[in-house]
Protein backbone atom coordinates (compact mmCIF):
# COMPACT_ATOMS: atom_id res chain seq x y z
CA UNK A 1 0.00 0.00 0.00
CA UNK A 2 2.90 2.38 0.71
CA UNK A 3 3.91 2.55 -2.96
CA UNK A 4 0.47 3.44 -4.30
CA UNK A 5 0.43 5.79 -7.27
CA UNK A 6 -1.47 8.93 -6.32
CA UNK A 7 -2.71 11.77 -8.46
CA UNK A 8 -2.34 15.27 -7.02
CA UNK A 9 -5.58 16.48 -5.41
CA UNK A 10 -8.00 18.76 -7.21
CA UNK A 11 -7.41 22.25 -5.81
CA UNK A 12 -10.05 24.97 -5.70
CA UNK A 13 -8.16 28.16 -4.77
CA UNK A 14 -9.53 30.74 -2.38
CA UNK A 15 -11.25 33.65 -4.11
CA UNK A 16 -9.74 36.16 -1.68
CA UNK A 17 -6.61 35.93 0.48
CA UNK A 18 -6.14 32.31 1.50
CA UNK A 19 -6.58 32.02 5.28
CA UNK A 20 -8.25 28.61 5.70
CA UNK A 21 -8.39 25.18 4.07
CA UNK A 22 -11.02 22.45 3.75
CA UNK A 23 -9.90 18.92 2.83
CA UNK A 24 -12.97 17.06 1.56
CA UNK A 25 -12.66 13.36 0.75
CA UNK A 26 -14.82 11.46 -1.75
CA UNK A 27 -16.26 7.99 -1.30
CA UNK A 28 -15.58 4.59 -2.84
CA UNK A 29 -15.49 4.55 -6.65
CA UNK A 30 -15.52 8.34 -6.98
CA UNK A 31 -12.86 11.02 -7.53
CA UNK A 32 -12.30 14.49 -6.15
CA UNK A 33 -14.13 15.87 -9.17
CA UNK A 34 -17.33 14.29 -7.85
CA UNK A 35 -17.53 16.95 -5.13
CA UNK A 36 -16.45 19.97 -7.18
CA UNK A 37 -20.08 21.01 -7.73
CA UNK A 38 -20.70 20.85 -3.97
CA UNK A 39 -17.76 23.20 -3.42
CA UNK A 40 -19.32 25.69 -5.83
CA UNK A 41 -22.59 25.31 -3.91
CA UNK A 42 -20.81 26.11 -0.65
CA UNK A 43 -19.07 29.16 -2.15
CA UNK A 44 -22.04 30.70 -3.93
CA UNK A 45 -22.94 33.09 -1.08
CA UNK A 46 -19.34 34.35 -0.90
CA UNK A 47 -19.04 33.49 2.78
CA UNK A 48 -16.07 31.16 2.18
CA UNK A 49 -13.98 33.35 -0.12
CA UNK A 50 -10.85 32.91 2.02
CA UNK A 51 -11.07 29.11 1.94
CA UNK A 52 -9.06 26.83 -0.34
CA UNK A 53 -10.65 23.45 -0.98
CA UNK A 54 -8.54 20.33 -1.45
CA UNK A 55 -10.37 17.42 -3.10
CA UNK A 56 -8.06 14.36 -3.04
CA UNK A 57 -8.31 11.48 -5.52
CA UNK A 58 -8.16 7.95 -4.10
CA UNK A 59 -5.72 5.51 -5.72
CA UNK A 60 -7.14 2.61 -7.70
CA UNK A 61 -7.02 -0.52 -5.54
CA UNK A 62 -8.60 -4.00 -5.65
CA UNK A 63 -11.89 -4.00 -3.74
CA UNK A 64 -12.88 -7.40 -2.38
CA UNK A 65 -16.59 -6.54 -2.36
CA UNK A 66 -16.25 -5.69 -6.07
CA UNK A 67 -14.94 -9.19 -6.91
CA UNK A 68 -11.38 -7.91 -6.54
CA UNK A 69 -11.70 -5.45 -9.40
CA UNK A 70 -9.81 -2.19 -9.05
CA UNK A 71 -11.60 1.06 -8.32
CA UNK A 72 -10.80 4.31 -6.49
CA UNK A 73 -10.74 3.55 -2.78
CA UNK A 74 -9.08 4.67 0.42
CA UNK A 75 -9.10 1.13 1.85
CA UNK A 76 -10.47 -2.27 0.91
CA UNK A 77 -14.11 -3.15 1.61
CA UNK A 78 -14.75 -6.83 2.24
CA UNK A 79 -18.56 -6.77 2.04
CA UNK A 80 -21.29 -4.26 1.20
CA UNK A 81 -24.59 -5.56 2.48
CA UNK A 82 -25.79 -2.51 4.38
CA UNK A 83 -25.17 -4.05 7.80
CA UNK A 84 -23.21 -2.46 10.61
CA UNK A 85 -21.54 -5.78 11.36
CA UNK A 86 -20.19 -6.22 7.82
CA UNK A 87 -18.43 -2.86 7.80
CA UNK A 88 -16.93 -3.33 11.26
CA UNK A 89 -15.80 -6.90 10.60
CA UNK A 90 -12.33 -7.62 9.17
CA UNK A 91 -11.45 -4.00 8.43
CA UNK A 92 -8.51 -3.24 6.15
CA UNK A 93 -6.35 -1.78 8.90
CA UNK A 94 -3.24 -1.49 6.72
CA UNK A 95 -5.13 0.40 4.03
CA UNK A 96 -6.82 2.66 6.58
CA UNK A 97 -3.53 3.57 8.23
CA UNK A 98 -1.86 4.22 4.86
CA UNK A 99 -4.63 6.65 3.92
CA UNK A 100 -4.52 8.20 7.39
CA UNK A 101 -0.83 8.99 6.89
CA UNK A 102 -1.63 10.57 3.52
CA UNK A 103 -4.28 12.86 5.02
CA UNK A 104 -2.08 13.79 7.96
CA UNK A 105 0.56 14.75 5.39
CA UNK A 106 -1.95 16.96 3.54
CA UNK A 107 -2.80 18.68 6.82
CA UNK A 108 0.89 19.19 7.64
CA UNK A 109 1.59 20.67 4.21
CA UNK A 110 -1.12 23.26 4.78
CA UNK A 111 0.36 24.10 8.17
CA UNK A 112 3.84 24.36 6.63
CA UNK A 113 2.44 26.76 4.03
CA UNK A 114 1.26 29.11 6.77
CA UNK A 115 -2.32 28.01 7.46
CA UNK A 116 -2.90 27.46 11.21
CA UNK A 117 -4.25 24.04 12.17
CA UNK A 118 -7.28 25.69 13.75
CA UNK A 119 -8.13 27.09 10.30
CA UNK A 120 -8.30 23.62 8.71
CA UNK A 121 -11.38 21.40 8.39
CA UNK A 122 -11.22 17.79 7.19
CA UNK A 123 -14.14 15.59 6.23
CA UNK A 124 -15.87 13.69 3.50
CA UNK A 125 -18.64 11.40 2.33
CA UNK A 126 -19.06 7.65 2.96
CA UNK A 127 -15.62 6.02 2.85
CA UNK A 128 -14.16 9.51 2.60
CA UNK A 129 -16.16 10.66 5.62
CA UNK A 130 -14.91 7.67 7.57
CA UNK A 131 -11.32 8.58 6.65
CA UNK A 132 -11.91 12.26 7.45
CA UNK A 133 -13.35 11.41 10.86
CA UNK A 134 -10.58 8.94 11.68
CA UNK A 135 -7.76 11.15 10.37
CA UNK A 136 -9.14 14.26 12.05
CA UNK A 137 -9.56 12.70 15.48
CA UNK A 138 -6.09 11.12 15.34
CA UNK A 139 -4.33 14.28 14.10
CA UNK A 140 -1.55 15.65 16.31
CA UNK A 141 -2.87 19.20 16.07
CA UNK A 142 -6.16 20.89 16.93
CA UNK A 143 -8.31 21.35 13.83
CA UNK A 144 -11.19 23.76 13.23
CA UNK A 145 -13.74 21.04 12.52
CA UNK A 146 -14.50 17.58 11.16
CA UNK A 147 -17.27 16.52 8.74
CA UNK A 148 -18.54 12.94 8.39
CA UNK A 149 -21.40 12.37 5.95
CA UNK A 150 -23.08 8.96 5.64
CA UNK A 151 -20.10 7.38 7.34
CA UNK A 152 -18.83 5.67 10.46
CA UNK A 153 -15.87 5.32 12.83
CA UNK A 154 -13.06 3.16 11.50
CA UNK A 155 -11.24 0.64 13.68
CA UNK A 156 -13.76 1.40 16.41
CA UNK A 157 -12.78 -1.62 18.49
CA UNK A 158 -9.25 -0.25 18.99
CA UNK A 159 -9.83 3.43 18.22
CA UNK A 160 -9.00 4.62 21.74
CA UNK A 161 -5.53 3.09 21.44
CA UNK A 162 -4.85 4.99 18.21
CA UNK A 163 -5.71 8.48 19.43
CA UNK A 164 -2.62 10.54 20.33
CA UNK A 165 -2.12 11.86 23.85
CA UNK A 166 -2.98 14.57 24.55
CA UNK A 167 -6.19 14.32 22.52
CA UNK A 168 -5.91 17.48 20.45
CA UNK A 169 -9.41 17.19 18.94
CA UNK A 170 -11.45 16.11 21.96
CA UNK A 171 -13.47 19.34 21.78
CA UNK A 172 -13.27 19.93 18.02
CA UNK A 173 -16.80 20.27 16.57
CA UNK A 174 -17.80 17.21 14.53
CA UNK A 175 -20.60 17.57 11.96
CA UNK A 176 -22.20 14.19 11.25
CA UNK A 177 -25.18 13.63 8.95
CA UNK A 178 -26.89 10.50 7.65
CA UNK A 179 -29.96 9.53 5.67
CA UNK A 180 -32.18 7.08 7.54
CA UNK A 181 -32.84 5.14 4.31
CA UNK A 182 -29.15 4.53 3.52
CA UNK A 183 -28.79 1.01 2.02
CA UNK A 184 -24.97 1.10 1.80
CA UNK A 185 -23.74 2.51 5.12
CA UNK A 186 -26.57 1.57 7.43
CA UNK A 187 -28.10 4.45 9.38
CA UNK A 188 -27.62 2.36 12.54
CA UNK A 189 -23.86 2.45 11.99
CA UNK A 190 -24.01 6.24 11.87
CA UNK A 191 -25.96 6.46 15.13
CA UNK A 192 -23.68 3.87 16.75
CA UNK A 193 -20.70 6.05 15.79
CA UNK A 194 -22.41 9.14 17.21
CA UNK A 195 -23.20 7.38 20.48
CA UNK A 196 -19.70 5.92 20.81
CA UNK A 197 -18.03 9.28 20.19
CA UNK A 198 -20.32 11.02 22.68
CA UNK A 199 -19.56 8.36 25.28
CA UNK A 200 -15.86 9.09 24.76
CA UNK A 201 -16.51 12.80 25.28
CA UNK A 202 -16.27 14.10 21.71
CA UNK A 203 -18.19 17.16 20.51
CA UNK A 204 -20.62 15.64 17.99
CA UNK A 205 -23.67 17.11 16.29
CA UNK A 206 -25.66 14.49 14.34
CA UNK A 207 -28.38 15.34 11.83
CA UNK A 208 -30.80 12.80 10.36
CA UNK A 209 -32.24 13.33 6.88
CA UNK A 210 -35.51 11.35 6.68
CA UNK A 211 -35.92 9.26 3.54
CA UNK A 212 -32.45 10.05 2.18
CA UNK A 213 -30.42 7.11 0.87
CA UNK A 214 -26.66 6.93 0.37
CA UNK A 215 -26.34 10.42 -1.02
CA UNK A 216 -26.38 14.10 -0.11
CA UNK A 217 -29.19 16.63 -0.43
CA UNK A 218 -29.37 20.42 -0.79
CA UNK A 219 -30.52 20.87 2.80
CA UNK A 220 -27.47 18.93 3.97
CA UNK A 221 -25.12 20.94 1.74
CA UNK A 222 -26.56 24.17 3.14
CA UNK A 223 -25.97 22.89 6.68
CA UNK A 224 -22.35 22.12 5.80
CA UNK A 225 -21.92 25.63 4.39
CA UNK A 226 -23.22 27.05 7.68
CA UNK A 227 -20.84 24.81 9.64
CA UNK A 228 -17.85 25.86 7.53
CA UNK A 229 -18.78 29.54 7.81
CA UNK A 230 -19.01 29.22 11.58
CA UNK A 231 -15.76 27.29 11.95
CA UNK A 232 -13.78 29.29 9.35
CA UNK A 233 -14.96 32.91 9.64
CA UNK A 234 -13.31 35.46 7.42
CA UNK A 235 -10.16 36.88 8.97
CA UNK A 236 -11.15 40.28 7.57
CA UNK A 237 -14.41 40.10 9.54
CA UNK A 238 -12.49 39.35 12.74
CA UNK A 239 -10.15 42.31 12.13
CA UNK A 240 -13.08 44.64 11.55
CA UNK A 241 -14.74 43.52 14.79
CA UNK A 242 -11.54 44.22 16.77
CA UNK A 243 -11.11 47.67 15.21
CA UNK A 244 -14.64 48.62 16.24
CA UNK A 245 -14.00 47.81 19.91
UniProtKB/Swiss-Prot annotation:
GO terms for biological process: fatty acid metabolic process. Keywords: Cytoplasm, Fatty acid metabolism, Hydrolase, Lipid metabolism, Nucleus, Serine esterase. SUPFAM superfamilies: alpha/beta-Hydrolases. It comes from the Eukaryota. Its main location: cytoplasm. Signal peptide: none annotated. GO terms for molecular function: carboxylic ester hydrolase activity; palmitoyl-(protein) hydrolase activity. The keyword Lipid metabolism applies. Its EC number is 3.1.2.-, 3.1.2.22. It is an enzyme of class 3 (hydrolase). It catalyses: S-hexadecanoyl-L-cysteinyl-[protein] + H2O = L-cysteinyl-[protein] + hexadecanoate + H(+). Transmembrane segments: none annotated. Disulfide bonds: none annotated. Hydrolyzes fatty acids from S-acylated cysteine residues in proteins with a strong preference for palmitoylated G-alpha proteins over other acyl substrates. Mediates the deacylation of G-alpha proteins such as GPA1 in vivo, but has weak or no activity toward palmitoylated Ras proteins. Has weak lysophospholipase activity in vitro; however such activity may not exist in vivo. Belongs to the AB hydrolase superfamily. AB hydrolase 2 family. This is Acyl-protein thioesterase 1. The lineage of its organism: Eukaryota, Fungi, Dikarya, Ascomycota, Pezizomycotina.
